[in-house]
């Protein structure tokens, strides 16, 4: 084996097995070196035709190399075999040792004279003239120097510049026989390899061996090159995949991913929102608020109509109202009617954990809006970003966002053509500088719908489902006092789901009443097993509430009473006013307290003070809240007068004691009134409790029948 190491070409290993087999083994060679000259001369007389029978015979045509020209053999031999010099004084890499000798062979047997080795071989004895002529024509070629060491990029670079011998090596190694044979000009008339070997008087057996060694070396070089390229390609692919996984892991980390993100997160606000399918026809039950916003839309469509009189486009509109009344729906209707760019943002989208992000997003939002003026910006949950500025060590930089919002709405730079619509259900938390004229010029209240508005909303949502003609939306509207638009939509949807579960083809009043009770009293829990004793206590408890509500003048009418467990309670009495109540009188508040006391009073009268239960805790909470508001907010206490007390913690001990005394008096009087009514109507109380134990649920008409002493129809 010869090791071909080059700094220019990849390492090529050329096995010349057939040529080396012609020489003796290492031991025989070492002996032949010390043989006298006379013995060598005697061996030279061996006939040439007595070649060893072990020499292999190979056809060059089988390797595909028979078409080589004659002129290629000289350069091929120059690139393949090293030159031999008898004079050891010639400077050569064969006489240079960096770590040890040039090969393991010389480490073991010492330096040999190559001509002596050749002359002692059987091949030389058989063909002395042929080998002598070949070796005389061979040129010095240092490519077969065995270079041993750590194969690193640093060591290879150092070898290129370490010694002049390496530079000579790099100069003599032309792109070797691989590049020479593949890129040679094919138009040149070169002699074939076969003719050249015949000219040099090389026997056919040795020609085949020589060509076989050449072919094997060429194929080995190609295989090693391909293997190296494949390894590099796989390594690069693995590193690239690991890099992608690393970047993905950083992006998934909530703390590190922010550093790789720009000021996105407000993409929905920066891009205009199209709301072509929502108009003011979809808004029901809030006619006054809708009228206010329709004027703004008209201003956007035809500004000359208003500016001819010197009017200006309003800069901000603040929508205020309880949850579910349609504030966001109104803003969407403005977007659909105005036909101008509409930008949406939520108050919680501005601020994050890093300082300055909120102010930057405010600037980006208004910069985009000004570039597309006239336009509308809708900020939902405005109290999240526009709350009052306070000095707090927990949020020392929270004022930057609202300050930037104030400057953009009405600051030094003009802001023409951009209308800001804000929505909140907590206007008390807004900063005073934000709600002043010039920023939010208009404040529109979006209240809960009245009976007429609830009827319109129910008709709108009923038209989206299949319902029976016997359904009367006005009856449902009168029984849903205080419901918002969102709650009415949920009521209709729950009724449709109930009808689908029961296998009905359309929604009837039964499903609507069921969904109303489910919203008012909670879902039924029929799987709960209650013993007769607790069921009896619950029946008398709920009957006590119903008796007080029925016989108290200013109490709200009864809607339904049940001892079916619903939600967290074992029973419930639903009260609904006949009409919308815009305010409440002192008599109505006292009646509510009396109704709340009815449950505990009934337990005490029927079962005794030792058997009262904890079921009245929520009733006492409700009664105490009413009494406290009457004393501290409504000015309904004769002793304390019309003064209000918003923060009782800052009051003097005497005042606090007086407030507590007045609340205690109101509760005691309410308890006594409820006890008087139940003692007076003890028979009706008993009949109603027995009816509840029998039927579990009674509506207003059935309760009236029982209290009048009549019998209910068998269900």
From Swiss-Prot:
The annotated active site, in chain numbering, is 542
Show the GO MF annotations.
ATP binding; ATP hydrolysis activity; ATP-dependent peptidase activity; metal ion binding; metalloendopeptidase activity
Q: Which residues cross the membrane?
A: 238-258
Record: residues binding Zn(2+):
541, 545, 619
Task: Give the EC number(s) under which this enzyme is classified.
Answer: 3.4.24.-, 3.6.-.-
Give me the Mitochondrial matrix side stretches, as residue ranges: 1-237
Any phenotype upon disruption?
Complete embryonic lethality; embryos present a clear developmental delay at 8.5 dpc, and the hearts of mutant embryos fail to beat properly at 9.5 and 10.5 dpc. Cardiomyocyte-specific gene disruption gives rise to animals that develop dilated cardiomyopathy and myocardial fibrosis at about 20 weeks after birth; mutants have a median life span of about 46 weeks, much shorter than wild-type. Mitochondria from mutant cardiomyocytes are smaller than normal, but have normal cristae architecture and display no significant difference in the assembly of respiratory complexes.
Question: What is its cofactor?
Answer: Zn(2+)
Q: Which UniProt keywords apply?
A: ATP-binding, Hydrolase, Membrane, Metal-binding, Metalloprotease, Mitochondrion, Mitochondrion inner membrane, Nucleotide-binding, Protease, Transmembrane, Transmembrane helix, Zinc
HAMAP family listed in its UniProt record: FtsH
Q: What is this protein called?
A: ATP-dependent zinc metalloprotease YME1L1
| Species of provenance | Mus musculus (Mouse)
Starting at the broadest rank, the lineage of the source organism is: Eukaryota, Metazoa, Chordata, Craniata, Vertebrata
Gene designation per UniProt? Yme1l1
């Amino acid at each position: 084996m010869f090791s071909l190491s080059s700094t220019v070409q990849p390492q090529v290993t050329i096995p010349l097995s057939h040529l080396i087999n012609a020489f003796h083994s290492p031991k025989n060679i070492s002996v032949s070196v010390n043989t006298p000259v006379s013995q060598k001369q005697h061996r030279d007389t061996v006939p040439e035709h007595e070649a060893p029978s072990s020499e292999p015979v190979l056809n060059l045509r089988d390797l595909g190399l028979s078409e080589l020209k004659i002129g290629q053999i000289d350069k091929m031999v120059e690139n393949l075999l090293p030159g031999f010099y008898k004079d050891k004084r010639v400077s050569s890499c064969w006489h240079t040792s960096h770590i040890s000798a040039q090969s393991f062979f010389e480490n073991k047997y010492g330096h040999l004279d190559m001509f002596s080795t050749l002359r002692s071989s059987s091949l030389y004895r058989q063909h002395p003239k042929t080998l002598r002529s070949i070796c005389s024509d061979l040129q010095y070629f240092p490519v077969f120097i065995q270079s041993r060491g750590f194969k690193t990029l640093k060591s290879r670079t150092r070898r290129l510049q370490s010694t002049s011998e390496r530079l000579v090596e790099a100069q003599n190694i032309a792109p070797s026989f691989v590049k020479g044979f593949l890129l040679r000009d094919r138009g040149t008339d070169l002699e074939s390899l076969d003719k050249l070997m015949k000219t040099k008087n090389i026997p056919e057996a040795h020609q085949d061996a020589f060509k076989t060694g050449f072919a094997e070396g060429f194929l080995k070089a190609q295989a090693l090159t391909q293997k190296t390229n494949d390894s590099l390609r796989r390594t690069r692919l693995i590193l690239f995949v690991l890099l992608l996984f690393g970047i993905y892991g950083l992006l998934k980390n909530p703390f590190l991913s922010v550093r790789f993100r720009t000021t996105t997160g407000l993409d929905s606000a920066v891009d205009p929102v199209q709301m072509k399918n929502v108009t003011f026809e979809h808004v029901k039950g809030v006619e006054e608020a809708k009228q206010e916003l329709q004027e703004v839309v008209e201003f956007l469509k035809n500004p000359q109509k208003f500016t001819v009189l010197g009017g200006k486009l309003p800069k901000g509109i603040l929508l205020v109202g309880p949850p579910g009344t349609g504030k966001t729906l109104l803003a969407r209707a403005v977007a659909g009617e105005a036909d101008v760019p509409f930008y949406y943002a939520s108050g919680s989208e501005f601020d994050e954990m890093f300082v300055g992000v909120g102010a930057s997003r405010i600037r980006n939002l208004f910069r985009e809006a000004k570039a597309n003026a006239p336009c509308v910006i809708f900020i939902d949950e405005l109290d999240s970003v526009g709350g009052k500025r306070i000095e707090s060590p927990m949020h020392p930089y929270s004022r930057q966002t609202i300050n930037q919002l104030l400057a953009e709405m009405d600051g030094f730079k003009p802001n023409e053509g951009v209308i800001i619509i804000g929505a909140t259900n907590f206007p008390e938390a807004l900063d005073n500088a934000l709600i002043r004229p010039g920023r939010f010029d208009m404040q529109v209240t979006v209240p809960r719908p009245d009976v007429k508005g609830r009827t319109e909303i129910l008709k709108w949502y009923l038209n989206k489902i299949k319902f029976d003609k016997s359904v009367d939306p006005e009856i449902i509207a009168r029984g849903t006092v205080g419901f918002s638009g969102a709650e009415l939509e949920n009521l209709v949807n729950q009724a449709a789901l109930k009808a689908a579960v029961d296998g009905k083809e359309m929604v009837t009043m039964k499903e609507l009443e069921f969904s109303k009770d489910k919203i008012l009293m909670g879902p039924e829990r029929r799987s709960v097993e209650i013993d007769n004793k607790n069921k009896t206590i619950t029946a008398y408890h709920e009957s006590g509430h119903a008796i007080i509500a029925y016989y108290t003048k200013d109490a709200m009418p009864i809607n339904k009473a049940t001892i079916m467990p619903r939600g967290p309670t074992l029973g419930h009495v639903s009260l609904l006013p006949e009409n919308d109540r815009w305010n409440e009188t002192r008599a109505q508040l006292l009646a509510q307290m009396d109704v709340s006391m009815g449950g505990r009073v009934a337990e005490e009268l029927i079962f005794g003070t030792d058997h009262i239960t904890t079921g009245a805790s929520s009733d006492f909470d409700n009664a105490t809240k009413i009494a406290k508001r009457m004393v501290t907010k409504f000015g309904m206490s004769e002793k304390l007068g019309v003064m209000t007390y918003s923060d009782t913690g800052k009051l003097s001990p005497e005042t606090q004691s007086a407030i507590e005394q007045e609340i205690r008096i109101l509760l005691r009087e309410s308890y006594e009134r409820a006890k008087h009514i139940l003692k007076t109507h003890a028979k009706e109380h008993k009949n109603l409790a027995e009816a509840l134990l029998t039927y579990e649920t009674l509506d207003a008409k059935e309760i009236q029948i029982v209290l009048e002493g009549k019998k209910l129809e068998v269900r």
